[in-house]
């Protein structure tokens, strides 16, 4: 897990909100962020008192919306940035990064 933009590091982007926790992760399961993986992501995100956002190539979507996550088209090898705010933001980002790094417990 590392910190930094998920898209081109030279691209202009809005700064994350104060107190936001961020992590950059690579989708490493065989099917990418598909329907079952998105459901697991949303369920995990929902366990925390935090607002989670997912960013890929400059597009940012709420981590609570399965359809929006699917629309990111995060295939295997895609680099995404997780950002969270709220009381449990750090725990949420850590759990989501771990879920992704564990290939959504699929492979």
Identify the function of each model-found stretch.
Residues 26-76, 83:
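Compact, glycine-rich, soluble single-domain proteins
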Residues 2-12, 39, 43, 66, ...:
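Long, contiguous binding/interaction regions
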Residues 20, 51-53, 61, 72, ...:
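Protein-protein interaction regions
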Residues 3-4, 22-28:
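Non-catalytic helical/linker scaffolds that mediate oligomerization, partner binding
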Residues 12-18, 46-47:
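Acidic-glycine-rich active-site phosphate/pyrophosphate-binding loop
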Residues 75-107:
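C-terminal structural segments of small proteins and small subunits
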Residues 18-24, 79-81:
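Intrinsic-disorder/low-complexity, polar/charged segments enriched in Ser/Thr/Lys/Arg/Asp/Glu/Gln
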Residues 1-2, 7-11, 31-33, 70, ...:
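Generic signature of intrinsically disordered, low-complexity, basic-rich segments
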